[in-house]
């Protein structure tokens, strides 16, 4: 399961909110996280953490969890 490809449903299940096309947002008490995806989603994406723009490539839930853990963002539903 942890190596599942990222899909829109998975992002929504993880607490990311679908704001507009190709923009997802996840909020915690201390962080405001936006996960941007382009038309080739999920091959390329940008993670924005407290206004810091971080280009990343994330293909699986495991990779997304690992990346967010580096930035101390706890997503409880993994």
Where are these regions (language model features)?
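Short acidic DE-rich linear segments
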Residues: 72-78
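Negatively charged, low-complexity tracts enriched in Asp/Glu with abundant Ser/Thr
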Residues: 1-26
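Acidic, low-complexity, intrinsically disordered interaction modules
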Residues: 17-64, 68
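Residues marking helix boundaries in flexible regions
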Residues: 7, 47-50, 74
